[in-house]
């Protein structure tokens, strides 16, 4: 039986040769309702300030590969993905992450989201960290919106391993993790006051991590690229913007439009 697929990509990306063939190959499995391609970020020499974006997407891609190896990828990115035409659902107009929600609703119907690193979309990094900040805030807001709209997927008794993957990979990242991360400092300070060596060492390591993040921030301001310092900076930068996503979601409630982040020249 012939199955029709709808393939979607972003206007500012370039697909690799053979990407479409790979997506069609993956979709031949009747258990697959969606095929997620890999997003790759191209970093130009003059875009050292946004090197963390490329590192983040390498990490995210590795997680998606492991998710699919376990059972199913947890959502698809709009840069490149495909769905069975028969499974398409119209999203509400105020949806911020329509590609993510659509793909997971397909998974909730019992289909898998296949992940293929052989089909990828190449995109230039954000022009600078200010543009990357805008992107991260709106994606975080979309993630929070998704947690509510996909709340049925939190039921592990119904969705089993898919629910576990969704909660561990997405829900915790968009809800508890940023709050817990910044609550750790005062908690570790209190524990260190007990005089226990272990707590003192943990506090020192945490402060060192924050210091590296601050140094990464200062170097970013000077457009100096240093991965050792930029990784802790980008990690903290991401979690701060998740918290900012709460206010963004409240401010833009009822609208799914947003200002696109400016990208560097590819």
Regions found by a protein language model. Name each.
Residues 123, 173-254:
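Membrane-embedded multi-pass helical conduit in multi-pass membrane proteins
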Residues 257-266:
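Membrane-proximal intrinsically disordered regions of secretory-pathway and membrane-system proteins
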Residues 9-26:
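Acidic donor-binding/catalytic loop of UDP-sugar-dependent glycosyltransferases
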Residues 2-7:
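Short, small-residue-biased leader/transition segments that mark boundaries at the very start
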Residues 27-59, 94-98, 103-169, 234, ...:
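Catalytic donor/gating beta->alpha subdomain of glycosyltransferases that bind UDP-sugars
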Residues 66, 70, 170, 174-178:
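Loop-to-transmembrane-helix entry motif
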Residues 8-14, 92-94, 106:
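The conserved acidic donor/metal-binding loop of glycosyltransferases
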Residues 77-90:
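Conserved nucleotide-sugar donor-binding
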């Amino acid at each position: 039986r012939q199955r029709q697929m709808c393939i979607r990509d972003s206007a500012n990306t370039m697909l690799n040769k053979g990407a479409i063939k790979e997506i069609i190959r993956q979709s031949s499995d009747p258990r697959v309702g969606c095929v997620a391609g890999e997003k790759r970020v191209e970093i130009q020499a003059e875009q050292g300030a946004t090197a963390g974006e490329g590192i983040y997407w390498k990490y995210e891609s590795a997680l998606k590969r492991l998710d699919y190896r376990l059972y199913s990828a947890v959502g698809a990115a709009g840069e490149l993905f495909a769905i069975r035409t028969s499974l398409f659902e119209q999203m509400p107009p105020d949806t911020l992450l329509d590609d993510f929600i659509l793909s997971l609703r397909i998974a909730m119907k019992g289909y898998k989201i296949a992940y293929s690193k052989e089909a990828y979309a190449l995109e230039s990094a954000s022009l600078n960290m200010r543009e990357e900040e805008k992107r991260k805030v709106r994606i975080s807001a979309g993630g929070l919106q998704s947690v509510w709209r996909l709340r049925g997927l939190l039921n592990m008794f119904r969705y089993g391993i898919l629910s576990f993957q969704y909660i561990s990979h997405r829900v915790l990242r968009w809800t508890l993790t940023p709050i817990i991360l910044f609550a750790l400092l005062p908690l570790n300070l209190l524990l260190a006051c007990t005089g226990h060596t272990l707590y003192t060492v943990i506090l020192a390591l945490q402060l060192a991590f924050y210091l590296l993040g601050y140094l990464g921030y200062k170097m970013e301001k000077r457009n100096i690229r240093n991965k050792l310092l930029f990784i802790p900076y980008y990690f903290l930068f991401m979690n701060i913007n998740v918290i900012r996503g709460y206010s963004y979601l409240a401010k833009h409630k009822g609208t799914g439009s947003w200002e696109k982040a400016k990208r560097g020249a590819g």
